[in-house]
C-alpha cells in the first residue's frame, strides 16, 4: 500500500522557511552604516531614531545594538567612513627637482578637486556641518592622523621652493593651510548648491591655480 504525502498534497501546509543566514559582522556593519547615511541625510541627527535605521537595514533594534551601542556611536562610525583620507602624496621628489607652482598644482590642487567628484565627500561635509559636534572624536582623529601630516608635507614643499628660489615668499609659504582655502570655498559652494557641477569645479580650479601663480611666482 502506497502512503500519501500529506504535506505535499495539502495546499494549506507550506514548506518550512529556510533558516536566516547570519552575515559576517563587517557586512552587517556596512549595511547599517549605509542605511544610517540615508536616515541621517533625510531626517537629520536629532530627528533620526534607532528604529528608523533598524527598519532601513531590515533588522530589529536588537540587531543594531549587536554592533552599535547608540545612535551617537553609529554617527561617529559613519563619519569615520565618510571622511576621506587626504589624497596620498606622489613619489618623493628627487633632491635636485625644483618645487614650482606647476608642481604644487599637480601634487596639491588637482587631487583636491578630483576628490570633489566623489559624492561621499559632499555627504560627509553636509553631516559635519549639520551635526559634526555630536561626534568630535571622528573629526579630531582625521585631523590629527591625516590632515595635519598632509599640511606638514605641503609646508616642506613650500619652504624648499622658497630656498631654491622657485617660489616667492608670501602669506601662503608662511601659513601653508592657505594653499587649500580656495578649494575649501569651492567645496562649501557645492554643499550649498547640492551638487558638484563639473563646469563650476573647473572654474574654481582655474581661479585657484591663478591665485597660486600670482602669489608664488618669483
PLM feature segments, named:
Residues 112, 125-129, 179-183, 212:
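Short alpha-helical scaffolding segments that buttress acidic/His motifs in well-ordered protein cores
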Residues 1-43, 47-59, 66-73, 99:
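Basic, helix-initiating cap at the start of DNA-binding domains
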Residues 140, 144, 148, 159-211:
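Hydrophobic/aromatic-rich alpha-helical bundle segments in the mid-to-C-terminal region
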Residues 35, 39, 111, 182-189:
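Amphipathic alpha-helical interface segments
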Residues 116-144, 188-193:
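Amphipathic alpha-helical segments used for helix-helix packing
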Residues 39, 115, 153, 157:
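Short alpha-helical functional segments enriched in proximate histidine and acidic residues
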Residues 80-86:
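Short, basic, alpha-helical segments at the C-terminal edge of helix-turn-helix-like DNA-binding modules
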Residues 77, 91-123, 173-179, 205:
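Hydrophobic alpha-helical connector segments
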Amino acid at each position: 500500500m502506497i502512503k500519501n504525502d500529506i504535506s505535499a498534497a495539502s495546499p494549506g501546509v507550506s514548506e518550512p522557511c529556510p533558516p536566516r543566514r547570519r552575515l559576517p559582522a563587517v557586512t552587517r556593519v556596512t549595511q547599517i552604516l549605509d542605511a544610517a547615511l540615508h536616515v541621517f541625510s533625510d531626517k537629520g541627527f536629532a530627528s533620526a531614531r534607532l528604529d528608523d535605521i533598524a527598519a532601513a537595514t531590515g533588522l530589529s533594534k536588537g540587531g543594531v545594538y549587536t554592533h552599535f551601542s547608540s545612535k551617537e556611536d553609529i554617527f561617529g562610525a559613519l563619519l569615520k567612513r565618510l571622511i576621506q583620507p587626504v589624497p596620498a602624496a606622489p613619489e618623493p621628489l628627487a633632491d635636485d627637482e625644483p618645487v614650482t607652482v606647476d608642481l604644487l598644482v599637480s601634487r596639491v590642487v588637482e587631487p583636491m578637486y578630483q576628490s570633489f567628484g566623489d559624492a561621499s565627500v559632499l555627504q560627509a561635509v553636509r553631516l559635519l556641518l549639520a551635526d559634526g559636534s555630536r561626534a568630535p572624536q571622528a573629526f579630531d582623529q582625521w585631523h590629527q592622523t591625516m590632515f595635519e601630516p598632509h599640511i606638514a608635507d605641503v609646508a616642506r614643499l613650500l619652504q624648499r621652493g622658497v630656498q631654491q628660489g622657485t617660489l616667492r615668499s608670501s602669506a601662503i609659504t608662511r601659513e601653508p593651510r592657505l594653499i587649500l582655502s580656495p578649494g575649501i570655498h569651492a567645496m562649501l559652494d557645492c554643499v550649498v548648491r547640492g551638487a558638484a557641477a563639473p563646469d563650476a569645479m573647473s572654474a574654481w580650479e582655474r581661479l585657484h591655480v591663478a591665485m597660486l601663480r600670482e602669489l608664488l611666482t618669483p
